[in-house]
Amino acid sequence: MAGLAGRPGSWGGLVLRVGQALFAAACIGVMGSSLGFASYTAFCYLIASMGLQMLWSFGLACLDGYAIRANKDLTSPILLSLFVVGDWVTAILSFAASSSAAGVVILFQKDVLFCRRYPQLPCGKYELATAFAFLSWALSATSALIMFWLLAAF
């Protein structure tokens, strides 16, 4: 399992973490610049969840960068247990937030036609932020599965 792509302290792990953090930051940036997002609970939850995702992923990206630079091994069972719990929690929260935001976007666009009735509503930005959140979740879920797989191999 030492050669598994995406393990902590490897270039693959660093790329996964940086991708998670960048997509979460993009989601926060797009949603935060959207007019009226704070009026909808699902969008506020998305911002909070992506904030947590960004902090967790950025912290672990820094740890991966240090481990690569110092040639350290981050695959001890204690560290992997911490990574598994953190990754699963952030992945589940990110998926819930992304799904709820997607539900509101679909409601606005297809069901009640808010986007047509209220052209000042930035539905395109809501949709783009939700897409960024799903991309961040996909990378987070990938990391969570890799960490679980590594922990199970011990």
Swiss-Prot record:
GO terms for cellular component: membrane; plasma membrane. InterPro entries: CASP_dom, CASPL-5. Disulfide bonds: none annotated. It holds the Pfam family CASP_dom. Residues 39-42, 108-130 are extracellular. It is found in: Cell membrane. The chain crosses the membrane at residues 18-38, 43-63, 88-107, 131-151. The keyword Cell membrane applies. Residues 1-17, 64-87, 152-154 are cytoplasmic. It is a multi-pass membrane protein. It comes from the Eukaryota. Keywords: Cell membrane, Membrane, Transmembrane, Transmembrane helix. PANTHER family: CASP-LIKE PROTEIN 5B2, CASP-LIKE PROTEIN 5B3. Homodimer and heterodimers. Belongs to the Casparian strip membrane proteins (CASP) family. This is CASP-like protein 5B2. It comes from Zea mays.
